[in-house]
């Protein structure tokens, strides 16, 4: 069966046999900045942002297996925590950490359910969407030989064809944010991501929300699009069969925001220091010196490629 990419993408990631429901979880295929020592540096940066904004709790939207939530606790964040994802509560989370099972993609959990899991009002919380928007399925379109923008359809083996013309709000979005009439050019229509992000702000009403992701802005849109697949640490052909992650970069400038900063700027403003510790500490406290070196290494990883180029899209709820 051949269907629009957006529908196939949703089923491949979040359906009953979807990639994000697999027992090994995403970490079985790739790591993100939420893992290991880098995850603790990211957590410290988020704690700094929460402190500046007055947020008392944190909700991790697209929480995976709870890696960032665990990192937040490990760096001393004492406020309420809750995670939202498509799987049941992961083993090993601290007992006081809330968990919500959601449908996945742009289908959000009910705000009352999230509030109950967090144990405090969402208006006092920071919602973190780390690499969530890039896996919110969106319409994949391509300009045909006549200059018309048409949906790209795909079958279970990844074979594509051009389908119906893009119309309505989706076409309006493309004309405003990603205009092109070059035959063969691709457009990943970000309307679904814009709407999902707006729903987080308008339905959940957090004190602040931050979307941390890779993406592009007007003038840097890739003419061939960015749809990609990852499996077992490798880039593979995008096939919507549930065996691989499917992702596309985010049109950052179309998202509602109060501020957009780079990942590197976020670390410099709110995160741990990347300055080497005094070498004299190695003689008086060797273990502390080694721990400080590890912290600096993690901070420098966040400052460098690729995480330093990620965007932090910050908005009030």
Model-assigned labels for residue ranges:
Residues 34, 48, 171-317:
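Long, Lys/Arg- and hydrophobic-enriched amphipathic alpha-helices
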Residues 6, 10, 135, 218-223:
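Short, solvent-exposed beta-strand-terminating loops
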Residues 125-176, 224-232:
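A mobile, often basic/glycine-rich helix-loop segment
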Residues 105-108, 115-116, 122-142, 187-191, ...:
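A short SAM/SAH-binding and catalytic strip from SAM-dependent methyltransferases
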Residues 89, 133-134, 215-217:
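Short, solvent-exposed loop/turn segments at secondary-structure junctions
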Residues 59, 84, 127-130, 212:
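Active-site flanking residues adjacent to catalytic metal/cofactor-binding acidic residues
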Residues 1-104, 108-122, 141, 279, ...:
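Rossmann-like AdoMet
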């Amino acid at each position: 069966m051949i269907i629009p990419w957006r529908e196939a993408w949703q089923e491949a990631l979040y359906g009953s046999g979807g990639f994000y429901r697999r027992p090994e979880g995403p970490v079985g295929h790739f790591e993100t900045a939420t893992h290991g020592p880098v995850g603790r540096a990211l957590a410290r940066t988020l704690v700094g942002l929460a402190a500046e904004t007055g947020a008392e709790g944190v909700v991790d939207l697209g929480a995976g297996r709870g890696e960032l939530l665990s990192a937040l606790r490990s760096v001393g964040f004492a406020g309420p925590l809750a995670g939202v994802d498509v799987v049941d509560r992961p083993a090993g989370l601290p007992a006081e950490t809330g968990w919500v099972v959601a449908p996945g993609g742009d289908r959000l959990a009910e705000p009352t359910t999230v509030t109950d899991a967090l144990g405090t009002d969402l208006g006092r919380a920071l919602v973190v969407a780390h690499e969530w928007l890039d896996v919110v399925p969106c319409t994949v379109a391509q300009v045909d030989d006549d200059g018309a923008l048409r949906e790209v359809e795909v079958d279970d083996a990844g074979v594509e064809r051009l389908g119906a013309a893009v119309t309505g709000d989706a076409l309006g979005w493309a004309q405003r944010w990603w205009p092109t009439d070059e035959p063969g050019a691709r457009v990943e229509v970000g309307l679904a991501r814009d709407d999902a992000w707006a729903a987080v702000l308008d339905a959940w009403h957090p004190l602040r929300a931050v979307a941390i992701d890779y993406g592009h802005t007007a003038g840097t849109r890739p003419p061939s699009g960015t749809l990609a697949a990852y499996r077992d640490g490798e880039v593979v052909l995008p096939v919507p069969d549930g065996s691989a992650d499917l992702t596309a970069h985010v049109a950052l400038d179309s998202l509602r925001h109060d501020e957009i900063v780079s990942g590197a700027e976020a670390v410099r403003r709110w995160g741990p220091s990347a300055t080497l510790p005094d070498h004299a500490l190695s003689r008086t406290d060797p273990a502390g010196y080694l721990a400080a070196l590890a912290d600096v290494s993690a901070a420098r990883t966040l400052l460098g490629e690729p995480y330093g180029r990620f965007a932090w899209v910050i908005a009030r709820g």
